[in-house]
Amino acid sequence: MSTYPPPTGEWTTGLCGCFSDCKSCCLSFLCPCIPFGQVAEVLDKGMTSCGLAGLLYCLLLHAGVAVVPCHCIYTCTYRRKLRAAYDLPPEPCADCCVHMWCGPCAISQMYRELKNRGADPAMGRQPAFSLSLTSHCRFFLKSKYYHIIKKNWRTVKYG
């Protein structure tokens, strides 16, 4: 049985197809900073770490509650990057509207889209067979030595 990559120009799952991947669904609704950070890391090709993107999302989420939903503007920029990368249509409506009214569903859809296209956000930017230090954001949040570990890991790994 051979598998073909999904065609460019169309989404592999719908906005409300959250239950096709229970992990991304639960994370997107209970702790959206984690799947969003993973998506941002993949879309930025490692230039933004999972932890940093997730932390910024949380700060914007709580800072903008009273005035403007700042996190929607931040997350819709990544939806635009994803759409540009795979030539996806703005469905079901404009990117900012999707993130404003269906934020967790939109984050879950972005996560699933990358996963269905072969770039598993849970693995970070690394190939599936290698250990990724930024894959679950644990090191960023728990270790004060994160940057030293990451620098040494890249030195050993890429030599």
From Swiss-Prot:
Keywords: Membrane, Transmembrane, Transmembrane helix. InterPro entries: PLAC_motif_containing. The chain crosses the membrane at residues 52-74. Expressed in roots, coleoptiles, leaves, stalks, apical meristems, immature ears, endosperm, pericarp and tassel spikelets. It is found in: Membrane. One of its GO terms (cellular component) is membrane. Its main location: membrane. Belongs to the cornifelin family. This is Cell number regulator 4. It comes from Zea mays (Maize). The lineage of its organism: Eukaryota, Viridiplantae, Streptophyta, Embryophyta, Tracheophyta.
